[in-house]
């Protein structure tokens, strides 16, 4: 465990560049899992990722200095996987499996570097895009989000006094520990850290992970952050993301291919991985549509990660679907990770813990909850909803419908086409906070 006085480090910061990303392992585990599959099945696809600020009231172009942002992005492009990191990836056990990553893939990673970026301002917001092979642009998602979020945090803390910073972090620590004390009461809880992309900062995420590891003991099952998993001897947690069905759908040549696209890429996933990595993310084009058209073999997968539908409703719908397929929900796994916090974790746990295997991914509300902690009452450290999504594939626009229309992304004409193919059933508009 590394003990850092975060307040002192923040106050004394005076370096020309304090790198936000210092390792290519400072990313979510599922990025590496997906990357290995992408390289196998989609080595030549050109995919653009774009950073999107859904919290429009926060004008990031006015908050973050462009020179500082470019310096951090440029620094990230200089980083390579180290020998130590590659040896750990080669020799560690993930999800009970040794040699998760092939020697060929690890040899390729040894020469990996992040591709170039495109950055400019428009109407008080940054437009940040990453163009190139999917095998490279996919790896920008997490570091780009972490960089933007931490630069915003640093700006909000600039000029604060030594003791004001002490109070800020003391309040945030006490707030987190109060959550831990509540979560301890949940029998059989299984919870992991999913908070890298929208964290306050790396040092704070590390403190949170170490605190929850001590506070929850065996109930804390690991972290999605590969670097923190390696450094803290934790399980690296993660399966797959929306980018897989989004890319597969954008490559579809007609409506029939579009309708089947989510299952085609899941079939490729199951050719690559097995066991507890067979977790389906059903909401890219609507959960009801996914369950309606799903091949029978999807019911044999380990479980689902409901992401954008109201969690209780989504859980009930999936349990009913398993039963309709003759499967026992008690043998299946539900992973809840959308904007989870203590209250929602408690509610979901009480509702489902005796009916299905449960796991929780605790994200922004673990690693970036400074709401009400600033001594001056500022809201500049309140988290925002920042995402980095696929926006085009081989020149074709990419779409995400989501169970919540507020989270939909893509060209309006393409969204209309996708709605015609998948339908609008079950989509409910709710405010997006994080």
Swiss-Prot record:
An example of a GO molecular function for this protein is: nicotinate phosphoribosyltransferase activity
Q: Name one Pfam family in it.
A: NAPRTase_N
Q: How is it modified after translation?
A: Transiently phosphorylated on a His residue during the reaction cycle. Phosphorylation strongly increases the affinity for substrates and increases the rate of nicotinate D-ribonucleotide production. Dephosphorylation regenerates the low-affinity form of the enzyme, leading to product release.
Q: Pathway listed for it?
A: Cofactor biosynthesis; NAD(+) biosynthesis; nicotinate D-ribonucleotide from nicotinate: step 1/1
Top-level class of the enzyme under EC nomenclature: ligase
Gene3D superfamilies registered for this protein in UniProt = nicotinate phosphoribosyltransferase
- Cellular component GO terms, alphabetical: cytosol
Keyword annotations from UniProtKB, A to Z? Ligase, Phosphoprotein, Pyridine nucleotide biosynthesis
Instruction: Report the EC number(s), separated by commas if there are several.
Output: 6.3.4.21
Q: Which GO terms describe its biological process?
A: NAD biosynthetic process via the salvage pathway
| Superkingdom as given in the UniProt entry | Bacteria
Entry's family note: Belongs to the NAPRTase family.
Q: What is this protein called?
A: Nicotinate phosphoribosyltransferase
């Amino acid at each position: 465990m590394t003990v850092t006085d975060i307040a002192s480090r923040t106050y004394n910061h005076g370096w020309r560049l304090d790198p936000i990303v210092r390792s290519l392992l400072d990313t979510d585990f599922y990025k590496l899992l997906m990357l290995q599959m992408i390289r196998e099945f989609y080595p030549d696809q050109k995919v653009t990722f774009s950073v999107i600020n859904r919290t429009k009231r926060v004008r990031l172009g006015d908050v973050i200095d462009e020179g500082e942002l470019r310096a951090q992005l440029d620094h990230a492009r200089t980083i390579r996987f180290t020998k130590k990191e590659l040896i750990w990836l080669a020799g560690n056990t993930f999800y009970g499996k040794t040699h998760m990553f092939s020697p060929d893939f690890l040899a390729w990673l040894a020469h990996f570097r992040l591709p170039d970026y495109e950055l400019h301002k428009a109407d008080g917001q940054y437009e940040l895009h990453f163009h190139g092979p999917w095998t490279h642009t996919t790896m920008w998602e997490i570091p780009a989000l972490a960089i933007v979020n931490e630069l915003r945090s640093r700006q909000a803390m600039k000029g604060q006094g030594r003791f004001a910073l002490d109070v800020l972090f003391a309040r945030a620590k006490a707030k987190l520990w109060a959550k831990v004390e509540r979560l301890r009461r949940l029998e059989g809880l299984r919870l992991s850290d999913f908070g890298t992309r929208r964290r306050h900062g790396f040092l704070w995420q590390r403190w949170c992970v170490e605190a929850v590891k001590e506070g929850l003991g065996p109930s804390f099952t690991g972290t999605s952050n590969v670097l923190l998993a390696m450094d803290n001897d934790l399980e690296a947690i993660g399966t797959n993301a929306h980018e897989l069905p989004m890319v597969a759908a954008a490559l579809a040549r007609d409506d029939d291919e579009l309708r089947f696209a989510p299952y085609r890429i899941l079939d490729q996933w199951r050719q690559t991985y097995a066991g507890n990595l067979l977790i389906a993310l059903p909401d890219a084009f609507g959960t009801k549509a996914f369950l309606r058209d799903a091949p029978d073999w999807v019911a044999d997968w380990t479980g689902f990660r409901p992401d954008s539908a109201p969690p209780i409703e989504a859980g009930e719908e999936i349990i009913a679907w398993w039963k309709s397929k003759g499967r026992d929900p008690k043998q299946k796994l539900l992973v809840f990770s959308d904007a989870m916090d203590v209250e929602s974790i408690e509610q979901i746990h009480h509702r489902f813990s005796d009916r299905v295997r449960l796991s929780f991914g605790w994200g922004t509300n673990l690693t970036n909850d400074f709401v009400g902690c600033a001594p001056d009452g500022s809201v500049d450290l309140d988290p925002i909803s920042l995402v980095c999504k696929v926006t085009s594939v081989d020149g074709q626009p990419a779409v995400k419908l989501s169970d919540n229309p507020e989270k939909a992304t893509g060209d309006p004409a393409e969204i209309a086409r996708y709605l015609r193919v998948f339908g609008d059933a079950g989509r409910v508009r709710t405010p997006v906070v994080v």
